[in-house]
A protein has these predicted regions:
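Surface-exposed binding/hinge segments that line
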Residues: 96, 140-181
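Long beta-strand-rich cores associated with HINT superfamily self-processing modules
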Residues: 498-524
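Gly/Pro-rich hinge or "lid" segments in bacterial periplasmic/extracellular proteins
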Residues: 86, 170-222, 226, 344, ...
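Periplasmic binding protein-like
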Residues: 48-49, 382-438, 445, 474
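Extracytoplasmic/peripheral linker and loop segments enriched in polar/acidic and small residues
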Residues: 389-400, 431-501, 524
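Ligand-site clamp/hinge motif
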Residues: 185, 215-260
Length: 524
């Protein structure tokens, strides 16, 4: 459904305050098909209320931040990114670079899937191949190249790459292992994993799952017997359900909701810095004659956005304006510049470039980031102030926005998009967003159509550098080059915030907005 800005004139301050309160006329009603939680959790059941629909417990296409918590409870990888954003062993007990293009890996002894089948080297080889074959894979874009798998024993194998991939131990944390005969180049809706929980019921269309503890799990026995996962898109409903005890944990909440929950008996807030960047990213598939194909026009539009007001009044200081093309908390990130609010300059530049009668379509998926609708409504008003007409297109979770991102669903100009930093390394995020090639774009897999061969070469060169200091220097140059192309109208880095009932203990919230369910316990 397309929504357009309100016709009456509002001051920017009024709109920002109105948007922060969730009262703008553009706000879409919650999905009627998505029911809220019913009844309090049992004494041995942990109930999670997610802000986005978890359509699969596989991650080939679907890995938003909070989903990782649930997906890794069922399926696991060779490694995981743990505290301090460092790689830790999971299914592998050895993962070593033994040559610039070779890693030696050994599977843990005795690891089995929840149905009793042993994990094999063939399962790993098949998993790597399936991630490479799936269309539109988010994970594939993180890799400079996928490794090949050479079995050297019953539990041992080597990972080979054509060029060095010095962060391969981090990247492989995103490849979840499934029995080879069950794996396919698609998002799996069923099947078993090696994790501490198995699926006992699932309604992927509604984003609802019930997980039960695996009795003979190979690792540490999780204290919680059952986990119930619900999709509750409306934040107010999630807050009410948490307060009443119907939900135990809710993720990705706004500061307004956090303020409501602060100090309430039985409720506790968890907060940490984040490694996700949220962007108003331009569509780089526009014809060369389109105004947005001109980086000067893209830059001019950035002056229309009052980022400080958005952070202060809509996001209520739960985020920081981006000062680089990736979050500065990532290893190798470079401060490249700042977004400046100057509407007079925006109007002047747009007029001088013949783009003073511009109309743009902004799209996003509900739940992409906290207060997303309010941010978009405020942005529409700011653009109106410099003479740019807008239409807003909001997708509900589970829709076909992926096709639009790939240029296969319809035309758009700007997308509200959140991109995670799942390895803690700037090079991974840069690889996924800005190292796309013409070959990638033939299948729609270049990020929003961004193809710049010179920048792709810079990033690829940095990605193969084994010396950390040298890699960071190369990455810094690449990041400045990206910034100068003006890929975003605006960007910010949100803080990670969730709320839990005090009966829930042991949540070690990571900057990637996930936590290890095996450490969670229920008190009382």
């Amino acid at each position: 459904m397309t929504r357009t800005p309100p016709s009456e004139t509002l001051s920017r301050r009024t709109l920002l305050r109105w948007g922060a309160a969730g009262g703008t006329g553009l706000a879409l009603s919650p999905l009627a098909a998505c029911a809220g939680p019913t009844g309090a959790p049992g004494p041995g059941t942990l109930t999670l209320g997610l802000n986005r629909s978890l359509v699969s417990l596989d991650n080939k296409l679907n890995q938003f931040d909070a989903a990782v918590t649930v997906q890794r409870a069922v399926r696991q990888a060779l490694t995981a990114i743990g505290p301090g954003m460092k790689p830790t062993p999971v299914l592998a007990d050895r993962f070593e670079m033994t040559a610039p293009t070779t890693w030696s890996v050994r599977l843990r002894e005795g690891i089995r899937y929840s149905d009793g089948r042993p994990v094999t080297v063939e399962d790993v080889a098949t998993a790597v191949r399936m991630y490479g074959e799936v269309a539109g894979s988010f994970i594939l874009g993180l890799f400079p190249e996928l490794p090949s798998v050479e079995a050297t024993g019953e539990r041992t194998f080597r990972l080979h790459t054509r060029k060095p991939v010095p962060v391969l131990d981090r990247l492989m944390a995103n490849v979840l292992i499934t029995p080879a005969k069950d794996n396919r180049p698609e998002e799996l809706r069923s099947g078993v994993g090696t994790g501490p929980y198995r699926v006992v019921s699932a309604n992927s269309g509604a984003g609802e799952y019930t997980l039960a503890r695996v009795p003979d799990y190979w690792g540490r026995r999780p204290p919680v017997e059952r986990v119930r996962v619900l999709f509750v898109p409306e934040e107010s409903s999630r807050v009410v359900a948490l307060r009443s005890g119907e939900l135990d944990v809710i993720d990705t909440i706004t500061p307004d909701s956090a303020e409501q929950l602060t100090g309430l008996p039985g409720v506790h807030l968890e907060k940490t810095s984040g490694v996700r960047i949220c962007q108003l990213f331009y569509n780089f598939r526009k014809p060369k004659t389109h105004p947005l194909s001109d980086p000067r026009v893209r830059q001019a539009l950035t002056y229309a956005i009052d980022g400080e007001s958005l952070v202060r009044d809509v996001l209520t200081d739960s985020a920081e304006q981006a000062e680089g093309v990736v979050p500065l908390s990532l290893q190798g990130a470079e401060r490249t510049g700042r977004f400046v609010h100057d509407p007079g300059r925006a109007r002047q530049l747009l007029k001088s470039l013949g783009a003073d009668d511009l109309k743009i379509r902004i799209m996003w998926e509900s739940g992409e980031f906290a207060a997303d609708t309010s941010v978009m409504e405020a942005v529409a008003e700011m653009l109106k102030d410099v003479g740019v007409r807008t239409s807003l297109l909001q997708f509900e979770p589970g829709g076909d926005i992926l096709k639009w991102r790939q240029g296969k669903g319809g035309d758009w100009d700007v997308i509200g998009n959140g991109f995670p930093g799942p390895t803690g390394q700037a090079v991974t995020m840069l690889q996924a967003m800005y190292a796309g090639t013409a070959e990638d774009e033939r299948t729609g897999d270049a990020f929003m159509g961004y193809v710049n061969p010179a920048i792709a070469r810079q990033i690829s060169d940095a990605a193969t550098e084994t010396d950390t200091a040298a890699r960071d220097r190369k990455l810094a140059a690449a990041q400045h080059a990206v910034w100068d192309t003006w890929p975003c109208m605006w960007a910010f880095v949100p803080k990670t915030l969730l709320a839990r009932r005090t009966r829930v203990e042991g949540i070690g919230l990571l900057p990637v907005n996930s936590y290890d369910l095996t450490a969670v316990r229920l008190e009382g």
